[in-house]
Amino acid sequence: MPGAHVVFAEPRHSYPGFAEGVGEEEMESRKPGQPYVLGHDPLELARLDRQAAIIERPTRMLLQAAGMAAGWRVLDVGTGLGHVARIAGEIVGPTGAVIGIDPSVQALAVARERAEAAGVRHVSFEEGDVSTWSTRQPFDAIVGRLLLFHLGDPVAAVRQSTRNLRNGGQFIAVDFDLGGARSEPRVGLAADVLGWIEQAFTVAGASPRIGARLGMILREAGLEQVATFGVQAYLSPQDRTSAALIAGVARTLAPVIVERGIATAEQLGIDTLEDRLAAEFQRADAVMLPPTVVGAWGAVTGR
C-alpha cells in the first residue's frame, strides 16, 4: 500500500514508544501493570505526532473496515493528542459526533486547541479514564488505539468500555504486534535494538505483541461477530523513517533499558543510534518491516 508507512505504537498515539496515551509521569517512575509506560515531555509529544502521521492511513482503513460511517457517535478512549478522534471525526462528518477521553490534562489541552484551530465542532474532549468514565447516551462505536498495549487487564478494560455502547455497537481496537518487526536481510544492530525495546516494554508491564491477541481479547470480553486483520508496511533502505522510529522509541525507553540491565548505555549509544541504524540499513540494502498495525472489532449484542 504506497505511502502506508506503519510504525510502532503511540500508548497513546503512533509508534511511541509504541503508544498514544499521554501520561505525565516519566517512564522510570512507572511500575509493572500501570497503564502507560512512556513519558510525555515535549520531545515525546513530538514523537507521538510523527508516529501518528505514519499510521494514519492504516488507522483510517481499519475504522472504515469496522463499519464506521457518517452520522455515527464515537468515543475515542485514551485519545492523547486527539489523532484518532480527528480521523473518526472526518469519517462520521458533522452529522456525527466524537468524544475523546484521556486522563492527561496536558494532552487534552493540545487536542482541544487543534480542534478549535481547525474549526471542528463535532469533536470534543473530556478528562477521563477508561476504567471509570461513562455516559447516559450510548455510542455507535468505541475506539482504543494503542491503548490495550499498556493495560494489565485489557479484557476488563474492554468490558468496562462496552457499557457505553448501544446494542449492536462496535468496540474497535487498534494496536501493534512487535513480533514481526524485522529487516530483510537481517541487520544486526536493528535486531538488537528491537529486542531491547520489546524486553523494556515487557518489564515495564506492557504487552508488545498484543496485536496478535486482539481478537481473543474481544471475544473474552463478550463481544460477538469479531473480525481482525493487520496492515504491514515495507520501508525501503533509503527511507530514514525506520531508523528514526526505532531510535525514537529506544530513547524514550532508555531509562528502562539501562536500569533493568537489558543493555548498557554504551551499547545503546542513543545520541548516534539513528544515524548508525540508517547507515546499516543502506549498507545492507535492507527493507524494514515495522511492527504490524492490527485492528480487531466486535459488536455488543443482546441489550
Set out the residue ranges of the language-model regions.
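N-terminal, positively charged/glycine-rich alpha-helical extensions of SAM-dependent methyltransferases
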Residues: 15-18, 22-45, 49-50
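Class I SAM-dependent methyltransferase SAM/SAH-binding core
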Residues: 75-77, 81-133
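A short SAM/SAH-binding and catalytic strip from SAM-dependent methyltransferases
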Residues: 140-154
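A short glycine-rich, Lys/Arg-flanked "PGG" loop and its adjoining helix->strand segment in the class I
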Residues: 155-170
